[in-house]
Amino acid sequence: MKVTYFLEVTSSWCFWSEPMWAELKARYAGRVAFDWEIAKMLPGDWPVSRAQCDWFYRRSGTIVRSPFMLNSGWFEPVKPGTYPAASYVAEAAKDFGFTGDEIRLALSHAGEREGQKIGRLEVAVAIAAQAGGKKLPAKKLRAAAESKAVAARIDASTQEFFAHQISQRPAFVLSDDIGDKAVFSGLVHLEPLTAAIDAMLADVAAYTSFKSHHGNPPAR
């Protein structure tokens, strides 16, 4: 069974979902494969001012009962035809073996807790390189983040996100090898996902048990 997490590094709702993501990975370690992919936000999804960004942060922070408010200091207007760098840098870090959460979490924390300008490539690269240490050299990371290969991967994962007929991040797509699929879009609470995962794991186990007793279906 696999769970794919679709995210945008600078999304406040993705920030709030991270404790739940970590809990899922710990709870189902060894039984479920976990992966994350970038789902780019559309131009109209971004706040148009720091004041508007703060308004969104007050709303999401209140809903999750956070004891702190996120920092909008990272905010800069998104120019037409451009995209904030943080997600590209996080994706590029995969080329250096950083397929876990550590690099994108470092970027998210730097932006949304410290207000660093993670939309700027040089800032995002510096943060990621520091988090990755010697295994993540800044010059090579920047080249990868600016490469056509990374852009193509992000475009492909974004298209996959929209192919599920969803629009809200975070999104979680649960799939298994018996063809079941469950899609959650915009949720940051643990219980709905654990209920679905438990049900799907039970079904997979049942199919395995049946096959061990009866084998494959008759050809005719």
Segments predicted by a language model, with ranges:
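C-terminal cap of thioredoxin/glutaredoxin-like
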Residues: 6, 10, 18-26, 109-220
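Structural alpha/beta surface segment adjacent to cysteine/selenocysteine redox centers
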Residues: 16-114, 211-217
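Short, cysteine/histidine-rich loop/knuckle motifs that typically chelate Zn2+
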Residues: 13
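Extreme N-terminal starter segment of soluble prokaryotic enzymes
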Residues: 1-4
